[in-house]
């Protein structure tokens, strides 16, 4: 095993995520601005080992990027809506077209009567109406939409629950450190 949790068996890499990687992911997803040295302190590894692990997690697409959470209301986006979109052909590039609309925050292809659920943010109901008429209904194959306005949000975010009990953390750390 190398320092980034990759195992080589008969020359083939088995890209596992060990508990140290999980700890790093848990730390970074809560605070992407945390220093490498602080992560190293928390997981009890050398900063160089942590940096290598983070680079490998990025290269493998497990860490897809870093961003700041901006308060929408401070920029005038006071209305959130969930829109069910029905199309004549589910798929058919519709998801990509919906995702290209700036006000659209999320696009999910779903099973059931509708083809997509999208989350949008607008400044008010008037701008929501314009968005529906001029952008969403203009997308190829859209035949119907059903809009639900969000009254209050209790939880919003993208933090994943990361299970840190998967393997014996201390055993992995000892192997990495050669102790």
Give the label of every model feature segment.
Residues 1-179:
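A compositional/biophysical signature of low hydrophobicity enriched in polar/charged and small residues
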């Amino acid at each position: 095993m190398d320092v980034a949790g990759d195992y080589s068996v008969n020359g083939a890499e088995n890209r596992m995520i060990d508990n140290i990687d999980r700890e790093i992911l848990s730390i970074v997803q809560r605070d992407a601005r945390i220093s490498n040295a602080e992560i190293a302190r928390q997981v009890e590894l050398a900063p160089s080992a942590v940096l290598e692990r983070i680079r490998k997690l990025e290269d493998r697409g497990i860490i897809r990027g870093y961003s700041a959470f901006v308060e929408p209301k401070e920029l005038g986006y006071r209305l959130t809506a969930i829109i069910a979109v029905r199309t004549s052909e589910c798929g058919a590039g519709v998801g990509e077209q919906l995702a290209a609309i700036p006000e659209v925050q999320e696009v999910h292809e779903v099973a059931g009567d509708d083809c997509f659920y999208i989350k949008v943010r607008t400044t008010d109901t008037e701008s929501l109406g314009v968005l529906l008429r001029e952008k969403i209904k203009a997308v190829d194959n859209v035949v119907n939409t059903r809009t639900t306005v969000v009254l209050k949000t209790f939880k919003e975010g993208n933090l994943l629950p990361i299970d840190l009990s998967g393997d014996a953390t201390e055993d992995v750390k000892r192997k990495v450190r050669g102790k």
